[in-house]
């Protein structure tokens, strides 16, 4: 039991350190890059593995073991998707409201699933940094992890709805609800 508490505390500290690493990077650069995401993930996971180079990554239902989603497998393809995402994130002339855009960014990042591990935490930090970068929050303190973890079944259902049926509306409403609930709790 004590080891589990220590491990949980270590994970929280790593998450906090990753947020501040990313925050410092975007304040210095004025934008979010693939390199920023690699630094965040490396801080979370204490490794330098970087972008996935080997195929075989699948997202599985933790109860049934059934494959829910297979992200891109080829490193070059992953890097191309990340470059497109980076361009989308940093294009402020597209006319998309930043709150809507953060929902789309989250979906795209999780779909790319560029790392061997730490994608969920990195994606949630990306949300926070995007909101800071666009002056929607002053400090990186809006943690969607609790909301997403509490509603994980709905999260994956809506994630698949976008992928299979291009239903972004329910996904966007879900993420916005999470932002609203989390904002009130913060």
Question: Across the structure, where does each feature detected by a protein language model lie?
Answer:
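FIC/Doc superfamily catalytic core
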Residues: 1-186
């Amino acid at each position: 039991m004590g080891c589990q508490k220590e491990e949980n505390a270590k994970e929280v500290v790593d998450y906090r350190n990753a947020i501040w690493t990313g925050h410092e990077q975007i304040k210095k650069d004025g934008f979010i890059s693939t390199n920023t995401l690699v630094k965040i993930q490396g801080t979370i996971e204490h490794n330098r593995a970087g972008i996935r180079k080997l195929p075989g990554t699948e997202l599985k239902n933790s109860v049934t073991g059934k494959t829910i989603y297979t992200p891109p497998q080829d490193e070059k393809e992953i890097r191309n998707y990340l470059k497109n995402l980076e361009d989308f994130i940093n294009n402020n002339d597209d006319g998309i409201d930043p709150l809507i855009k953060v929902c789309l960014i989250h979906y795209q990042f999780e779909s790319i699933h560029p790392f061997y591990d730490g994608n969920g935490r990195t994606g949630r930090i990306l949300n926070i940094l995007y909101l800071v970068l666009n002056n929607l929050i002053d400090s990186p303190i809006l943690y969607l992890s609790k909301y997403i973890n509490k509603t994980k079944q709905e999260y994956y259902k809506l994630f698949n709805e976008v992928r299979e049926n291009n239903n972004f509306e329910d996904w966007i409403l879900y993420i916005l609800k999470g932002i609203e609930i989390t904002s009130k709790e913060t």
